[in-house]
Amino acid sequence: MINKNEWLTVGLITSCHGINGQVKVKSLSDFEERFLKPGMRWLQKENEPPSKIELISGFKQPGKETFIVKLQGINTRNDAEQLKTFKILVRTDKLPKLKKEEFHLLELINLEVKTLENDELKTIGKVINLENEKNNLLIIELFKNQKKVLIPFVKEIVPLVDIKNQFVIINPPNGLLEL
């Protein structure tokens, strides 16, 4: 479960764009309006508290999972360059309401990963991150060797997500965990 008094990283500023202070944002969110719709946002530099900033405008780059956004007070390329590696955050109490069986992808981080072997559930690792360039992938750290494995987040491979009990069950194709 997401703590209602915390922050959720929904984007990462990766670079500046042009000469008028626009920044390129890698989305970590399924909700594009977070980078398109004007309004207040929060920026965070590593190891510093979040600060409020207004998003003036934004658009999605054609064929990519990145957005170009204009932020209040960021008017030059040098201003934009200072924001490289900043995170864009939302408060968890401002998350969109979901239906009963839905969840936010970021809720998957730190869930235990289990497989069904010989009719028994076996814990094999935990979800340590997500990758969502084109398709959602779970980044799983295996307990037996600390290897990181990418698991496609599709119903056939991840048939059960239990947010309440903090685990997912995966049914990986043969050899996927040995890569």
Curated annotation (Swiss-Prot):
It is found in: Cytoplasm. SUPFAM superfamilies: PRC-barrel domain (SSF50346), Translation proteins (SSF50447). Residues 100-176 form the PRC barrel domain. GO terms for molecular function: ribosome binding. The keyword Chaperone applies. Belongs to the RimM family. An accessory protein needed during the final step in the assembly of 30S ribosomal subunit, possibly for assembly of the head region. Essential for efficient processing of 16S rRNA. May be needed both before and after RbfA during the maturation of 16S rRNA. It has affinity for free ribosomal 30S subunits but not for 70S ribosomes. PANTHER family: RIBOSOME MATURATION FACTOR RIMM. The PRC barrel domain binds ribosomal protein uS19. This is Ribosome maturation factor RimM. The lineage of its organism: Bacteria, Bacillati, Cyanobacteriota, Cyanophyceae, Synechococcales.
